[in-house]
């Protein structure tokens, strides 16, 4: 089966990537190059212009086995200083984007215009989320998984820096090894911010993937899926004792996540779900208790538990969380 996608399919891949990044997109122009408005919650967000082609080997005995490329056919890429302009390839087999510096290829046209990248770069991004690669021309190519699409779009100019920036930005090639101390050692403010943001996103996405996977993407309080489920920390992130272990996570739908954070709901050390009487009385005093019966009816008696006992919420974390959150019951 061919891995080559049509432009409509590539647009769908981009839109899905924005969604996986935790943002939303309005399609302002569905003709290639695509123009999108990327936004979060009620904020207006920012516009991006996306040039994208399939990233393929291209075949031919003369081509190195590990050389992949995009061919700039159909339209000549052009950098637009008024908008974030992305020059991308999509490799369906590895499920990653590869991005090139638009300023190096603006106006590039020839009988067979192409831009190359190594298969190792694509493979590394698939396995480790991000990969920086210096092409023979000196240009820095960036490969990344879809959940980092918005982070790339926001920081493309910095990410494509070479020279003295290589040491700092090279940390992105091994995000598992990036410690807070290594982040603090980056003296350039812009690069430190970019690497810090991507590292935090990597850690959060890893936690989310593990927790939602453990619960089968079901809310532990009501059982709903519908892609409306978050990975919540049992001990809040703000507390020094919080961890990103799966055992400190619980899958909750948007409604029950908010109720959990507001201390209207809790879970005890026997995994039973509790509604706070004190918080309910506060709501009653404010005249905002309507719907509590239906709210209560939709709750399970005890939380849904992961299939693997190793992923169960740790009872010590539940006890600590109730202390930190000052649960009154």
Please identify what each model-predicted range represents.
Residues 1-43:
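N-terminal "first-domain core" detector
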Residues 44-76, 80-83:
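A broadly used, surface-exposed interaction patch
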Residues 55-58, 92-95, 257-259:
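Short, charged/polar surface micro-motifs in flexible loops or helix N-caps
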Residues 202-206, 214, 224-228, 234-329:
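A detector for short metal-coordination/catalytic motifs
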